[in-house]
Amino acid sequence: MKRVTSLLATVAMVFSVMVCSASAQAAGKLVVGGKGYTEQLIMSSMTAQYLAGLGYDVDQRDGMGSTVLRTAQLNGQVDLYWEYTGTGLVTFNKVVEKLSPEDTYLRVKALDEKVGLIWLDPSQANNTYALAMRKDFAKEKGIESISDMMEWLQSEDGKDAQMASNVEFSARQDGLKSLLEAYEFEMPRRNLRKMNSGLVYQALSQEVVDITMVFATDGRVKAFDFYVLKDDRNHFPNYALTPVVRQDALAANPELAAQLNVLSALMNDTTMSSLNALVDVDGLSIERVSRQFLEQNGLL
């Protein structure tokens, strides 16, 4: 009987150690996701380096599309990534009513909490969509706003104009389709050229196209001295860059929310645009730009 009791005690102790070890491992390991363009690659790299420096076991998985990444997080394959409030609200939750930046954040935060995704503090970086033209060309045509552009496209002078768009913008609920609906315009297929996100800036700069969609915080907008058209009907929602984390990951890592909020507080339009430009204009590596930023801010 004593041998049985001793054996049971030993088994219980081993099991307890295994459970504690497994819990510690789960609590310390995080999968950081990201999309496939510069800003997202910077943020996933920066977050992975930052968390690794804090002692977490980090697995970085980026280069995904928006829908694939969202699905991976919902399925528990990704613990956290940086999403945009407008994308979360319109694309994932199908809310199309016009809301203020604050209400956009509060609404998507409340909706996603129901599916176990927690939106932490939003940054001041608003990577909204925009339309841009070469500054001299826009001035020549007297175009200042999207309405001016739409009017020009219907004229004899502008009927053959070419617009560049990446594939995602042309397909998204909050992209080209809703833009054209908001401005009551039908764009013939011959006027639209779909291409990789990185090529739209070159296409406009090299006069291959006359108009292009851009991301507001992309460093190439300033580098190429493009003119960003006024969204005079306030169509595009706010796209505040925000860390979104699985509720289970936050529960397993009590300090994680505060740690990510520190990083979020450092991001604004100017900072994000500058970081993007270091990669896309100056040719520095994603890892180097991310590490330098962390070091400069005492986070690494």
Model-derived regions, located:
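Short, polar/charged alpha-helical segment
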Residues: 38-57, 73, 180-181
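Ligand-binding "clamshell"
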Residues: 92-120, 208, 220-234
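A bilobed periplasmic-binding-protein/Venus flytrap-type ligand-binding module shared by bacterial periplasmic
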Residues: 129-139, 240-253
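Beta->alpha turn/N-cap motifs
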Residues: 62-66, 76-89, 104, 197, ...
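Ligand-binding pocket segment of bilobal, Venus flytrap-like solute-binding proteins
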Residues: 157-231
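Extracytoplasmic "Venus flytrap"
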Residues: 29-47, 62-68, 168-171
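A conserved helix-loop-strand patch within extracytoplasmic ligand-binding domains
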Residues: 103-162, 265-269
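An extracytoplasmic/periplasmic, membrane-proximal ligand-sensing/linker region
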Residues: 39, 168-185, 255-300
